[in-house]
Regions:
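Acidic, surface-exposed loops and disordered segments
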Residues: 1-208
Length: 208
């Protein structure tokens, strides 16, 4: 009888243990936080380990015909200064001269491919979005950059294949807000009172 009592009591205690709830952000939260940041906190240095953690997602995502043509150059530490002058951020706000001095991305991921074509472009979008979502999950952020000087970038980093895009990575130090837009409205992003605003069409406006 004593043994049965002890077994029952042990079971009761096990059931009373507090359950550990892991508060991971939802996909909706990650997507909403994944903005194109053009200003970063220089105090948060992005390391090689951070970048490798972001790249962990790449083998998990889709690739056309499973060709997996993309290759990645990690640029961090002092080498990030090689990339700063070769990329441009905020083309719609030339008067802002973004990024401001001292607010450049802490690190970069340069995405390359020896192959080209529509499937590679689709792979590029899938991989870039996935990497940036992982960055947000890690408390960081980034920007998908297509406005850069590819030949000079390839030479500066001694890349063996053509750079297709650059991801700037860092700890964002700016506030970005999405605002509703209607068909016919300007969709240009803008800044007001130190905040950045991005007009977004609503689901009902996207339906055919």
């Amino acid at each position: 009888m004593a043994d049965n009592y002890l077994e029952k009591r042990a079971e009761e205690l096990r059931n009373q243990r507090p359950k550990v709830v892991r508060n991971h952000p939802s996909l909706e939260t990650l997507l909403k936080r994944n903005r194109s940041y053009r200003g970063y906190d220089a105090a948060r240095v992005v390391t090689e380990a951070d970048l490798l953690k972001m790249l962990e997602v790449v083998p998990w995502v889709g690739s056309g015909m499973n060709a997996q043509p993309l290759r990645f150059k990690l640029v961090y530490g002092a080498d990030a200064a090689l990339v700063h002058p070769l990329v441009k951020l905020g083309a719609a706000l030339p008067e802002e001269h973004l990024p401001h001095a001292g607010e450049e991305p802490s690190a970069y991921i340069v995405i390359c491919s020896a192959a080209s074509g529509r499937v590679v472009d689709i792979d590029l979008g899938i991989a870039a979005q996935s990497i940036l979502l992982r960055a947000v999950e890690m408390g960081l952020g980034g920007i998908f950059i297509l406005n850069f000087r590819p030949s000079e970038l390839a030479a500066a980093l001694q890349l063996p294949s053509q750079p297709l895009a650059v991801l700037g990575i860092g700890k964002p130090n700016e506030n970005i807000f999405m605002v509703p837009a209607a068909p016919g409205d300007s969709l240009d992003y803008y800044r007001k009172d130190g905040a950045h605003f991005v007009p977004k069409l609503q689901v009902k406006d996207l339906l055919l």
